[in-house]
Amino acid sequence: MARAFLFVLDSFGVGGAPDAAAYGDEGADTLGHIAEFCAAGAGDRAGLRSGPLSLPNMSELGLMHIARAASGQFPAGMPLPEKVYGVYGTANEISRGKDTPSGHWEIAGTPVNFDWGYFPTEGDAFPPELIEALCRAGDVPGILGNCHASGTEIIARLGEEHIRTGKPICYTSSDSVFQVAAQEAHFGLDRLLTFCRIARGLLDPYNIGRIIARPFIGQSASTFQRTGNRRDFSVLPPEPTLLDRLLQHGRHVHAVGKIGDIFAHQGISRVIKATGNEALMDASLSAIDAAEDGDLVFTNFVDFDMNYGHRRDVPGYAAALEAFDARLPEVHKKLKPGDLVVLTADHGCDPTWRGTDHTRERVPIIAFGPGIRSRSIGVRRTYADIGESIARHLGIPAGPHGRSFL
């Protein structure tokens, strides 16, 4: 039998999406622009990193060639490896959204072929009847925010008023989300999660993809910071995913990080919580040790998106990529004959782009493991090819939406 390890570098797009213009993202290229800025010295930060972007391990697995296939050019300032050892390619997204659930579900073989509900960008974001029902059911005196906002900005702006009044901070973005920020000690973490569960039920008729609990600590705008107790309350995928199919065939799915939340805990055998990319890698390595024949370990490395992409932080994103790349040899050392590792992303979030939202981009596909022969798999029609390749590797029947590249 075989094992598979699927690592999603959240938001690590490689540009070139053929439909990017329809999303206002023509020219967006997360990898390409980070490399360009680093090569020009704009990715330097004292005490963090300096110089051109350096990803030697992913480059040897085909990342440079992926970038050229996706966007038409090699990333600036990054040397070409003498030899490529991985299976490498890039994929288009066929789901209509450029959000986290759409990307992950499509990776798992289930594209999202419907439109999510979204909130208006002008005026109040949420209908009065929704707010009234939520405040009544959630036993709060009102809400703050009621707008599109950056999470860190709105906490800094409204956090002190939230502490004084007990009103949760509710906001949204260009994604199909309803986000609730509350101070852990003053409002209470359990109360926040209960409030979000209530919101999940009330928002189902609006077809909103996720309710996100955003707890924070601190007493003033200068000291507020988010904690690792974030929770996502997602709707169920529209049809069985790779995860469900694996469970149906007696396999186990080890969900590391926020994977369990993204799939509404459907198709999951074991949830492993960790906060931050370093801890997520540690947890993934432990899950590799625990995985049995036929199992899947599925990890989302969220820091790229949450801490650096949305915040448009080029040096931070570059440093996080370099730190991830430096730990790949630890993954290699864990592998046994029959193992397969796949690195990919769920969308882009170009830290040089206007605004703070995701960007529509192609994503990288890197696959490697003992006995895996290096080759290009070109540009794939859909992320679903990733899930179908894992299905084939693990010996379960193919699904309807993708084609294996193995």
UniProtKB/Swiss-Prot annotation:
Organism: Rhizobium etli (strain ATCC 51251 / DSM 11541 / JCM 21823 / NBRC 15573 / CFN 42)
Co-factor requirement: Mn(2+)
Alphabetized UniProt keyword annotations: Cytoplasm, Isomerase, Manganese, Metal-binding
InterPro entries: Alkaline_phosphatase_core_sf, DeoB, Metalloenzyme, Phosphopentomutase_DeoB_cap_sf
S-S bonds: none
Biological pathway: Carbohydrate degradation; 2-deoxy-D-ribose 1-phosphate degradation; D-glyceraldehyde 3-phosphate and acetaldehyde from 2-deoxy-alpha-D-ribose 1-phosphate: step 1/2
Pfam family, one: Metalloenzyme
Binding residues annotated for Mn(2+) 2, in chain numbering: D305, H310, H358
Gene Ontology annotations for the cellular component aspect, listed alphabetically: cytosol
Enzyme class, broadest EC rank: isomerase
The record's free-text note on cofactor binding: Binds 2 manganese ions.
Gene3D superfamilies assigned to the protein according to its UniProt record, in alphabetical order: Alkaline Phosphatase, subunit A (3.40.720.10), Phosphopentomutase (3.30.70.1250)
Annotated Mn(2+) 1 binding sites: D10, D346, H347
BP GO terms, sorted: 2-deoxyribose 1-phosphate catabolic process; 5-phosphoribose 1-diphosphate biosynthetic process; metabolic compound salvage; nucleotide metabolic process
Reactions mediated catalytically: 2-deoxy-alpha-D-ribose 1-phosphate = 2-deoxy-D-ribose 5-phosphate; alpha-D-ribose 1-phosphate = D-ribose 5-phosphate
Major localization listed first in the record, in broad terms: cytoplasm
UniProt record similarity statement: Belongs to the phosphopentomutase family.
Domain of life: Bacteria
Intracellular or extracellular location(s): Cytoplasm
EC number(s) recorded for this UniProt protein: 5.4.2.7
GO molecular function: magnesium ion binding; manganese ion binding; phosphopentomutase activity
Function, as annotated: Isomerase that catalyzes the conversion of deoxy-ribose 1-phosphate (dRib-1-P) and ribose 1-phosphate (Rib-1-P) to deoxy-ribose 5-phosphate (dRib-5-P) and ribose 5-phosphate (Rib-5-P), respectively.
Record-given protein name: Phosphopentomutase
